[in-house]
UniProtKB/Swiss-Prot annotation:
The family this protein is said to belong to: Belongs to the CowN family.
InterPro entries tied to this protein: CowN
Keyword Ribonucleoprotein: no
UniProt-recorded name of the protein: N(2)-fixation sustaining protein CowN
Native source organism of the sequence: Pelobacter propionicus (strain DSM 2379 / NBRC 103807 / OttBd1)
NCBIfam families (UniProt xref): N2Fix_CO_CowN
Pfam entry (one): CowN
GO biological process, one term: nitrogen fixation
Chain's role: Is required to sustain N(2)-dependent growth in the presence of low levels of carbon monoxide (CO). Probably acts by protecting the N(2) fixation ability of the nitrogenase complex, which is inactivated in the presence of CO.
Entry annotated with the keyword Repeat: no
This protein's UniProt keywords: Nitrogen fixation
Length: 101
């Protein structure tokens, strides 16, 4: 687990790697949603949105990114990670919620 540094969310986001944390969480999340035994139609649609985040030119100039998607679907993500007992990802999700959402 990485060492927590002092952050300054409300003024500058100083010390917060929001994009990096979001990318790390998506990698953890993909361990679950890429598993055919764990996915469903909701997560398949979520993966389509992740693809759009990776290529904004294909989304009619609408900018999506991992942090936006995490914020938009935070409760669904919590439910999935709790269901599969992924404590490491839950800890990171909570950190993202506190620091960046």
């Amino acid at each position: 687990m990485q060492k927590m540094t002092e952050t300054d969310r409300y003024v500058t986001f100083k010390g917060i790697d929001g994009d990096g944390n979001a990318r790390r969480l998506v990698a953890m999340l993909r361990r679950h949603i890429d598993d055919p035994a764990k996915t469903n139609l909701f997560w398949e649609k979520f993966k389509e949105k992740l693809e759009l985040a990776e290529s904004p030119d294909t989304n009619n100039t609408r900018r999506l990114d991992e942090l936006f998607l995490i914020h938009s679907y935070i409760n669904n993500i919590y439910d999935l990670l709790e269901e599969h007992g992924d404590q490491e990802a839950l800890t990171l999700l909570h950190q993202i919620e506190v620091e960046s959402c």
